[in-house]
């Protein structure tokens, strides 16, 4: 049960960070200098 909670928290954190990164890099994609995606 504890391992399941760890997996759930890791997945949620991963998707939240992925959504945040995609939302932030959306503005950077209009920028020609994309040094943060390297």
Swiss-Prot record:
InterPro entries: PSII_PsbI, PSII_PsbI_sf. The keyword Thylakoid applies. It is a single-pass membrane protein. GO terms for cellular component: chloroplast thylakoid membrane; photosystem II reaction center. Keywords: Chloroplast, Membrane, Photosynthesis, Photosystem II, Plastid, Reaction center, Thylakoid, Transmembrane, Transmembrane helix. It is found in: Plastid, Chloroplast thylakoid membrane. GO terms for biological process: photosynthesis. Its main location: plastid. The chain crosses the membrane at residues 6-25. One of the components of the core complex of photosystem II (PSII), required for its stability and/or assembly. PSII is a light-driven water:plastoquinone oxidoreductase that uses light energy to abstract electrons from H(2)O, generating O(2) and a proton gradient subsequently used for ATP formation. It consists of a core antenna complex that captures photons, and an electron transfer chain that converts photonic excitation into a charge separation. PSII is composed of 1 copy each of membrane proteins PsbA, PsbB, PsbC, PsbD, PsbE, PsbF, PsbH, PsbI, PsbJ, PsbK, PsbL, PsbM, PsbT, PsbX, PsbY, PsbZ, Psb30/Ycf12, at least 3 peripheral proteins of the oxygen-evolving complex and a large number of cofactors. It forms dimeric complexes. Belongs to the PsbI family. This is Photosystem II reaction center protein I. It comes from Guillardia theta. The lineage of its organism: Eukaryota, Cryptophyceae, Pyrenomonadales, Geminigeraceae, Guillardia.
């Amino acid at each position: 049960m504890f391992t399941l909670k760890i997996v759930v928290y890791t997945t949620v954190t991963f998707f939240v960070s992925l959504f945040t990164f995609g939302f932030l890099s959306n503005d950077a994609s209009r920028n020609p200098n994309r040094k943060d995606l390297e």
